Amino acid sequence: MEELMKALCRAWEDEWQGMVMGELRYSKGEGETNGPCEISWSGRKIIRIRAVKGAGRMEILLFPFSGKTVGKKREDKGTWWHTFSEEEVRSFSLALEDHNEIHQSHRPVVSGFQIASALTKGKNFERLRIHFHHPLYAGDAVYLKQAGNRDYGSSDVLCFEAVME
């Protein structure tokens, strides 16, 4: 999974600066994963970027960041899960060679890749899909609420919804 994340980061275009991830899809697939990654992207306002390596596949959607808080404050947030520190966010971003400055700013946005890595750590799954509803900032406590095979991650508002299968 990390190799596909790095491949997507290497595909970076300057005009994508400041955009936020709206969706991440990952599939381990079966069979051989050797060989180079194939990268493709399309779109102008909403950017779809795909990386394929052997049977593994990752796709993300990038959207312009509006800066607006969307959604109501959540009363039942679930159980505390994680609080990403500024240093943790910046280090993860640098290790992936993620060029988006929003992960290095004075109040860094937690990378969707970092959320995916933390959610899947130590878990056995074949597919992952995360919809990002609101940026999560370093220093904000994240609470998880599970409903079936879905995890809802919230700070004050719903930040992401993840499904692992």
Go through the PLM ranges and name each one.
Residues 1-30, 96-127:
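Active-site helix/loop of acyl-thioester processing domains in fatty-acid/polyketide metabolism
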Residues 1-81, 136-165:
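HotDog/MaoC-like acyl-thioester-processing domains
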Residues 75-108:
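A contiguous, surface-exposed recognition patch within enzymatic or periplasmic domains that forms
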Residues 92, 131-133, 159-160:
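Aromatic-residue hotspot detector
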Residues 123-141:
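A conserved acidic, glycine/proline-rich C-terminal tail/linker
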